[in-house]
C-alpha cells in the first residue's frame, strides 16, 4: 500500500513558511567577519612576504622543447604571441634584458 504524500509535503511547506534566516544569517555573518576576512588578510600578507625576485634557472637546450618547424606569422617569427622575455627562453637561450 502506498504511503500518502500529503503529510510530507505539508511538513516541508510549513518549515519554509517560518522565519527566513534569523539565527542562520547571524551565524554566517559572524563566520565571515571572524574567519573568512582574517584568513584572506593572512594569505595576502603571506604572499606579500614571499614575493621576492627569484633568479631564473640555468638554460638547458632540451631537444623536445621550443621546437620551431616554421616561423610564427608575427614579429620576427621566433617569439610566441605572449612571449615574456623575463621568464620564457628562446630555442637558443634566454634573452638578455
Curated annotation (Swiss-Prot):
Belongs to the cytochrome c oxidase subunit 6A family. This is Cytochrome c oxidase subunit 6A2, mitochondrial. Component of the cytochrome c oxidase (complex IV, CIV), a multisubunit enzyme composed of 14 subunits. The complex is composed of a catalytic core of 3 subunits MT-CO1, MT-CO2 and MT-CO3, encoded in the mitochondrial DNA, and 11 supernumerary subunits COX4I1 (or COX4I2), COX5A, COX5B, COX6A1 (or COX6A2), COX6B1 (or COX6B2), COX6C, COX7A2 (or COX7A1), COX7B, COX7C, COX8A and NDUFA4, which are encoded in the nuclear genome. Its main location: mitochondrion. It is linked to Mitochondrial complex IV deficiency, nuclear type 18: An autosomal recessive, muscle-specific, mitochondrial disorder with onset in infancy. MC4DN18 is characterized by hypotonia, limb and facial muscle weakness, and high arched palate. Some patients have respiratory insufficiency at birth and cardiomyopathy. Patient skeletal muscle shows decreased levels and activity of mitochondrial respiratory complex IV. Signal peptide: none annotated. Keywords: Disease variant, Membrane, Mitochondrion, Mitochondrion inner membrane, Oxidoreductase, Primary mitochondrial disease, Transit peptide, Transmembrane, Transmembrane helix. Residues 13-24 are mitochondrial matrix. SUPFAM superfamilies: Mitochondrial cytochrome c oxidase subunit VIa (SSF81411). GO terms for biological process: generation of precursor metabolites and energy; mitochondrial electron transport, cytochrome c to oxygen. It is a single-pass membrane protein. Component of the cytochrome c oxidase, the last enzyme in the mitochondrial electron transport chain which drives oxidative phosphorylation. The respiratory chain contains 3 multisubunit complexes succinate dehydrogenase (complex II, CII), ubiquinol-cytochrome c oxidoreductase (cytochrome b-c1 complex, complex III, CIII) and cytochrome c oxidase (complex IV, CIV), that cooperate to transfer electrons derived from NADH and succinate to molecular oxygen, creating an electrochemical gradient over the inner membrane that drives transmembrane transport and the ATP synthase. The chain crosses the membrane at residues 25-49. It comes from Homo sapiens (Human). Residues 1-12 form a transit peptide.
